[in-house]
Amino acid sequence: MITVEKMLNSSVHLGHKVKQWNPRMRIYIYGERKGLHIIDLLQTIVCLKKACNFLIRSVRKGKRALFVCTKRFFSILTQKIALKCNSFFVTKRWLGGILTNWITIKNCINKLKQLSKQKEKHHNLLTKKERLVLKKKKLKLKKYFSGMRDMTERPEIVIIIGQNKEINAVRECKKLGIASITILDTNCDPTLTKYPIPSNDDSILSVSLILSVLCNSINRGVNNKVRQKFDKYKKFKKLS
C-alpha cells in the first residue's frame, strides 16, 4: 500500500478550485490552500484499501475489470495498466450502451474478430471498393472495441478515471448495479460510485500512482486464485 509521502510527491492531495467543488465531497476534503481544496490523504488510504480488498476478492472469484478513461493524456497510461493486469479497457470514447446494450456491443466485438480472422485469399475475391469498405469498417471497430476484444460477457467491475467526463459510464454502472471504482476529484459526486477514491484526477503522476496500486491488487487476486487451485490439486493428489 502507498504512503502519504508518496501521494504528496505525486500531487494526489491537490483538488480543484474551491468554487468548483461538489459539497458531497466535503468528508474527503482536509482544507483549502491558495484557492484550492486539499484532499484528506488519510481518507484516500482508507478508500484505496477498501477498493483493493474488493478487487482481490472479486478477481479470486474469476471476475475481470474494465478500465475506462477517455482523457487524451491518460489513455496510453490506462491502456498499459489494463494490459499489465489482464483487464479490458475503453480509452477512445464511451459508446452509449456498452453496458446497458450489451448484446449489440457483443455483436460489434464478434464482427471485429471475424474481420480480423479473414484470410488474404478471401480479400482477393473482393473488388477494390469492397476491400476499402471492409478496411474502414475494421479500423472503426478496432478503434472502439480493441480493448474489449476478449470480453465475452458484461464486466462485473468498472474502474473509472475522471467521473465528470465519463458520466455516461458512471450512469450505466449505477443503472445495472455494477460495482464501480472511481478516482474522484473535489468536483465529483461520491454517491454515484460504490468505491470512491478521493484523489487528483488531473495529474498524470497522481492517476498513475492510484492505477498502479489497483493493478497490483488485481494481479494479487489472480495469484491467490492460482495458488488456491494448486492447493486443491495437491490435496486431491494426496487423497488419490
Curated annotation (Swiss-Prot):
A GO-annotated cellular component: chloroplast
Primary location class: plastid
One of the GO biological process terms: translation
GO MF, one annotated term: structural constituent of ribosome
InterPro entries in the record: Ribosomal_uS2, Ribosomal_uS2_bac/mit/plastid, Ribosomal_uS2_CS, Ribosomal_uS2_flav_dom_sf
Compartment(s) of residence: Plastid, Chloroplast
Organism superkingdom: Eukaryota
Pfam (any one): Ribosomal_S2
PANTHER family membership: 30S RIBOSOMAL PROTEIN S2 PROKARYOTIC AND ORGANELLAR, SMALL RIBOSOMAL SUBUNIT PROTEIN US2M
Entry's family note: Belongs to the universal ribosomal protein uS2 family.
Stated name of the protein: Small ribosomal subunit protein uS2c
Organism: Euglena gracilis
Taxonomic lineage of the native organism: Eukaryota, Discoba, Euglenozoa, Euglenida, Spirocuta
